[in-house]
Amino acid sequence: EEFIAPPLDPYKEALEGINELQRQQQKLDPKPFVFKLSEILRIYVQNRFNMPAMELTGEEFIIESVSNPFFQNYEDLLREFVDRGDRVKYSKETADTNETNLLLDSALHFVKDSHSRITDQESTDSQNQKTHSE
């Protein structure tokens, strides 16, 4: 009898990933840190919004996200996250902890905020369905 773990909630998975990364922040170089953070954010978007986020370039990721009305509030945040992240990942300069903290905060804010908006939306939807069915 093989035990198959239920798929993790994308939100919990993202939060756990970010918390885990926060714990390793001192040990990791900025580049691998940002690669991992970016991956967590994209996996969250991919699983939560059925968007092939892992296969997209930074620019495609922005265009794709922003085409979804839900993401329009986050355009600046995501664009900045991708731009800063790419600078850390691909430039020769070494990012300082300030920079990685900013990226971490942005990712965390995006995950928490989008999650609470979805949850609000879902509870509004289910209340609307109740009202209609009576």
Task: Specify the residue positions occupied by each region the protein language model found.
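Hydrophobic, helix-length membrane anchors
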Residues: 1-29, 117-134
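Amphipathic, well-ordered alpha-helical segments in soluble domains
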Residues: 10, 17, 40, 81-84, ...
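Cytosol-/stroma-facing membrane-proximal "stalk/adaptor" domains immediately downstream
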Residues: 71-134
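Conserved phosphate/pyrophosphate-binding and hydrolysis machinery centered on Walker-type P-loop NTPases
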Residues: 4, 8, 27-35, 51-55, ...
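A structural signal for long alpha-helical coiled-coils and helix-turn connectors
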Residues: 22-25, 66, 89
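Short, charged amphipathic alpha-helical segments flanked by flexible coils
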Residues: 32-84
